[in-house]
Amino acid sequence: MTIRDNHGVKVSGLAIMGGTFDPIHNGHLRTAVEILDRFHYSALKLIPCFQPVHKGRPSVLPQQRFEMAELAISSDDRLCVDSREMDREGPSYSIDTLRDLRSEVGPDESLIMVLGMDSFLSLPTWYKWQEIMDYAHLLVVSRPGWEPDLISELSGFCENYRAASPHELQCAPSGRVWFETLTPLGISSSMIRELARKKESIAYLLPEPVQKYIEQHQLYR
């Protein structure tokens, strides 16, 4: 996957964003498009998990979460929804997904996993978390003006893998960490679920086709 940026320079890289997407909302989508616009990666895959390892069971069926994600990205052909974790069923481990993707894109393609800061801070609790860097880079979306205290494991991890510039994520297939501040949107899936439960408006928090899908299927009631 190789394209040219606005200056004619070839840029490659496949970015991925995992999550429960219960439901997908404008915060997820804004993160995705800002990353694509800012770094000019070839594409970004949204990968809904079947069963999150560190959270409770999602509120709606896996197929419904997948369908909402597809509706949400239908107007941007740089985005796609990947069903591999849904197809696998059972707990969704990122390391398994990254191994699959690496085998598909080959050993030389840059693979970038996008994480929110909360997910990054919980990284040492993930299954085989230290092997992630063998397969991908991490692009961590940080909060404006917030410098979290890193536990010793993560502090050492950042010392070993932190990139000097985001360009390093495009020059190697894996093994670097970059922190990037994006536009903060105070939207969460739990907020939307609570509004829907109380039969209050969820307009403008998520794409209109997703809003209509939720209302049509009476989800989160």
Curated annotation (Swiss-Prot):
Molecular functions per Gene Ontology: ATP binding; nicotinate-nucleotide adenylyltransferase activity
Pathway, per record: Cofactor biosynthesis; NAD(+) biosynthesis; deamido-NAD(+) from nicotinate D-ribonucleotide: step 1/1
Enzyme Commission no: 2.7.7.18
Reaction it catalyzes: nicotinate beta-D-ribonucleotide + ATP + H(+) = deamido-NAD(+) + diphosphate
Enzyme class: transferase
A GO BP annotation: NAD biosynthetic process
NAD listed as a keyword: yes
Keyword S-adenosyl-L-methionine: no
Domain of life: Bacteria
Keywords in alphabetical order: ATP-binding, NAD, Nucleotide-binding, Nucleotidyltransferase, Pyridine nucleotide biosynthesis, Transferase
InterPro entries documented for this protein: Cyt_trans-like, NadD/NMNAT, Rossmann-like_a/b/a_fold
Pfam families according to UniProt: CTP_transf_like
PANTHER family: NICOTINATE-NUCLEOTIDE ADENYLYLTRANSFERASE-RELATED, PHOSPHOPANTETHEINE ADENYLYLTRANSFERASE
Family stated for the protein in its record: Belongs to the NadD family.
Known role: Catalyzes the reversible adenylation of nicotinate mononucleotide (NaMN) to nicotinic acid adenine dinucleotide (NaAD).
Protein name: Probable nicotinate-nucleotide adenylyltransferase
Gene name in the database record: nadD
